[in-house]
Amino acid sequence: MPRSSLGLRIPEGMHDLLPDELALQEQAETSALDLFKAWAYQKVATPTLEYGACIQPVEEEGDSFFKLFDRQGHVLVLRPELTTSIARMVSTRMRGTAFPLRLCYAADVFRYSKSHKQEFRQVGVELIGSASSAADAEVVALAIEALRKIGGMDFQINLGHMGIFTGIMAELGVPQEFQLHYQEKLARKDFVGIERLVKDYGFETRVQDVLLKLPHLHGKEDMLDQVLEWSRRPSLLEAVNALRQVYRYLKDFGVQDYVSLDLGILRGFSYYTGAVFEGYVPGVGFPVVEGGRYDALYGDFGEDAPATGFAINLKAIIEQMVCSNAERPEVLVYGSDVSKVIAEARKLRQTGKRVEMCLESLTQEQAMESAECKGIKEVVCAR
């Protein structure tokens, strides 16, 4: 039965991968996973579908999930990320495992997005059971090393701390309603909207000054001194010192030059509690790496454990890379006797070559023409 026009398309935001594209993705994914393994991270996998009771969104995230019902009427969700799924798995299947626990993954995730892409290939890590600044620095350094290994392009890592934002808001005493609007615009880097919002509320001069400077406060470690001029509140001082320590450890890891401190980073998921970071590459208008500390999440699953991690949007990086022909056949085998063609192809494959065999009898001229069309450099006649 002929397909309708809808049957010839794919759902909005989903994608096919052609051979060259898939080869490039698999190569990048393997490079990342090999690196994670070298840092003692073990690969895990979770179901594509989770119960909605596991993936509990905050209000602003709920509409971004793909939902359906099973035959018992339970709400199911296509996983929008792996962090929560891994928290469920660790808290149930791996309870009692010695901490710190280092896990990694490669998987597709699904969520509605303003970029019109709804299916994302991710690689990432979770470091569970350590509250130290060294753990925060480790995952940032590992994200940087992964980008260096798989991307082959310039990138920038921005590092911040959720406690600095909440501490400044508490010091200024701004209304909760204003804070939510301000936070939303800050996360979008909507500087014009921030200026209009601050002026509309008519705060005193000192408060306005801090609120307008905060979005532009980024750079190296000395930038943190400006924050301490605004307040010495204990919670704020603790957050500043924690961020400062992470940044210094990154120098020990040899990756500090890739990192800029940015106090305007506010992660989109509600569970981030400490150091947070984002990574950008040229040509992509959103972060290709997102991560940070989420110490409260495991408590929701009955396992009180601090944790940190990151995810790399592999699809976004692949789109900026040039597809290679690395996975295309190297040899085309032809001949008049199919049995001999099969035997010759088997022999060549045993040497490690990628071999395509002609399924019909071809002349040498026809075989050469076919190889040229397919980009195959070597042609062998089976005799």
Curated annotation (Swiss-Prot):
The keyword Oxidoreductase does not apply. Keywords: Amino-acid biosynthesis, Cytoplasm, Histidine biosynthesis. One of its GO terms (cellular component) is cytoplasm. Pathway: Amino-acid biosynthesis; L-histidine biosynthesis; L-histidine from 5-phospho-alpha-D-ribose 1-diphosphate: step 1/9. Pfam families: tRNA-synt_His. It is found in: Cytoplasm. PROSITE patterns: AA_TRNA_LIGASE_II. Transmembrane segments: none annotated. GO terms for molecular function: catalytic activity, acting on a protein; histidine-tRNA ligase activity; transferase activity. Its main location: cytoplasm. It comes from the Bacteria. GO terms for biological process: histidyl-tRNA aminoacylation; L-histidine biosynthetic process. Required for the first step of histidine biosynthesis. May allow the feedback regulation of ATP phosphoribosyltransferase activity by histidine. Belongs to the class-II aminoacyl-tRNA synthetase family. HisZ subfamily. Heteromultimer composed of HisG and HisZ subunits. NCBIfam families: hisZ_biosyn_reg. This function is generally fulfilled by the C-terminal part of HisG, which is missing in some bacteria such as this one. This is ATP phosphoribosyltransferase regulatory subunit. The gene is hisZ.
